[in-house]
Amino acid sequence: MPMMLPNKLFVLLLSLPALTAAFKLPASPGLTSAPQISSSAQPRIAQPPKCAESIVRGVGEGRKLQSPSGINTQPVIVQAGIVLAIFAAIGAGTAILHGPIFDAVRGSDLWNLSRPTWPILGFIYLAAGIAHFTEADGFENITPPNGTWGFYYTPFSPRFNVLWTGAVEIFGGGWMLFGAASQLAGIALPAALGPVVSDGALTLFLLTAIVTPANVYALTHGANFPLDLETPPKAHAIRLAFQSVLLAMLLEMAQPTLLDAQYNLGLL
């Protein structure tokens, strides 16, 4: 009997590892076990902090990134040549439309039907002028800063250019609509006001020529307007082609004012 205790104790000691594996006690609240990392686990790498404001192509500093047209990454001399060619094409298109093309259709049924409706363009300019103030950030984004293309320069800041051109658009569009509405209502305006529709049209013609660089800048530098919309180069090209149409229509409506000016200057 005395020899039985050591044998039982020996068996008990041998069974302790199995008992420990079968019955795991929960860890104490104050104690934590070290995590086991498998050999296949990848070590975590600290991520660089994200900038609060990331650069977006076509917006602000993002206009310096390569645009969809790729023009803004060309050498400055190449950019200048492309832009001057665009200006020349718009001018030539305006002259051709207002000259031989309008002359060919002037007096036709289509001309007589459509020509009286042209002052409706005043609504477009009036709305655009108001947008210069309500969407000033977007218009400023497509306004070329000084030094663009190596030659562009204005004495004012982009924001000021947005504001004063918006004011002129509101005046020109509203003045042209005022004259057209008076004619439609059969109201004779004082002669001192001059040819109201024509004066408004000439104002908008000059303004459209002045702001044309903004439309070209949107193409060359991919400048977004609205800020969250990236316009493809083909759409910009169509918009620039339509610039000639606008200029030709406004120049046609401005003829009475131009004739008055030539007469007053003794050129007629």
Language-model segment annotations:
Residues I55-L268:
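Membrane-interface extramembranous regions
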Residues M1-I45, E53-S54:
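N-terminal chloroplast transit peptides
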